[in-house]
Regions:
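Primarily membrane-embedded glycan-assembly and transfer machineries that use lipid-linked glycans
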Residues: 1-19, 31-37, 49-140, 146-155, ...
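Short helix- or helix-capping micro-motifs
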Residues: 22, 138-144, 190, 194
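N-terminal hydrophobic segments of proteins, predominantly signal-anchor/transmembrane helices
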Residues: 23-31
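Catalytic and binding regions of secreted/periplasmic enzymes and modules that target cell-wall glycans
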Residues: 46
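Short helix/loop segment immediately N-terminal to the Walker
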Residues: 104, 108, 179-185
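Membrane-interface alpha helices of multi-pass inner-membrane proteins
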Residues: 149-152, 169-172, 181-208
């Protein structure tokens, strides 16, 4: 029915309908209880750790009074967060702004996610236009997507902020690839994404290619890949110094690899192994499967 209202992708009303649908489906989620994830409660706990002058890479949320009642998942209570310095600093600022009130903090985390979602939609539209694709059609795959809304607004995941910076880096590197500053600007956005969640690093090679320019030779591509890596490393060092967290996020990358969830592919394999092997032999097999999973 909504598609019928939109009509052709190129009609003037199509964009208005796309925005209206996305907004109407997203707005209630801003005020709803968090669903599908307890990550925002962990963000609050990490913000509390920061607000009390502790390094979250060395001190888990379990050191904060009443952390269990505040909703943080006990699975990660003593684990360093797999997030970068920008994410942790934003968590601290939000907790301080909310006066350490958990309900208000969660609402502010939601607002930050809404800001990031708007940024994602903006950059998707710009990238679609830059590559000759219909903006409305590109946005339709993302904006009104229930999984997108549930993960980035209802659950308030910081992946939304990371994704916004990743897309911003690609867009500015593409948009200003003929200038001397387009590539560095793209790398800076990727660095901000990495400083939220290190997974953003996967787009750095593509930003390096855009910085190298059209029809670049392989030696030139490698040179700009190296330049991109050096610039990102320098910017990460600067952000680590400014926040006092340095490169603690590198060691924390193994945090999620130390646990497994039963319904994930490797969790299912480990669960199946537990049906046939017990005791020390099972621990050996479990560690082997976890090592393979980390490698992949």
């Amino acid at each position: 029915r909504i598609y019928q209202k939109m009509g052709d992708w190129n009609e003037p009303n199509a964009m208005r309908w796309m925005i209206a649908v996305t907004a109407s489906w997203s707005l209630p989620q801003i005020f709803a209880f968090t669903i599908y994830s307890r990550d925002m409660f962990s963000y609050y706990g990490q913000g509390m750790v920061m607000a009390h002058g502790l390094n979250p890479y060395k001190h888990g949320v379990s050191e904060i009074s009443n952390f269990m009642q505040n909703g943080a998942d006990p699975m990660w209570a003593e684990s360093p967060p797999p997030y970068g310095p920008v994410s942790l600093k934003l968590e601290e600022w939000i907790v301080r702004l909310a006066g350490e009130n958990i309900d208000l903090s969660l609402f502010y985390f939601r607002l930050l996610s809404v800001f990031a979602v708007i940024g994602i939609l903006f950059y998707v539209a710009k990238l679609a236009q830059a590559h000759g694709f219909n903006q409305v059609r590109a946005l339709w795959q993302i904006g009104p997507n229930p999984l997108f809304i549930a993960s980035f607004i209802a659950s308030g995941h910081n992946d939304s902020l990371m994704t916004m910076f990743m897309l911003g880096g690609l867009y500015y590197a593409k948009r200003y690839r003929d200038t001397w500053w387009g590539g560095p600007l793209g790398v800076t956005f990727v660095a901000l994404g990495v400083a939220v969640k290190p997974l953003a690093l996967v787009v750095l090679p593509f930003v390096g290619l855009l910085w190298a320019g059209k029809n670049a030779s392989w030696p030139r591509k490698f040179i700009f890949w190296v330049l991109s890596g050096v610039l990102l490393l320098a910017e990460m060092a600067l952000m680590g110094w400014a926040t006092g967290l340095e490169f603690g996020w590198i060691k924390a990358l193994s945090t999620t690899g130390g646990q497994y969830i039963w319904y994930t592919p490797f969790g299912l394999v480990i669960g199946a192994a537990s049906l046939f092997v017990q005791g020390d032999a099972f621990e050996v097999i479990r560690k082997l499967i976890e090592t393979v999973g980390k490698g992949i």
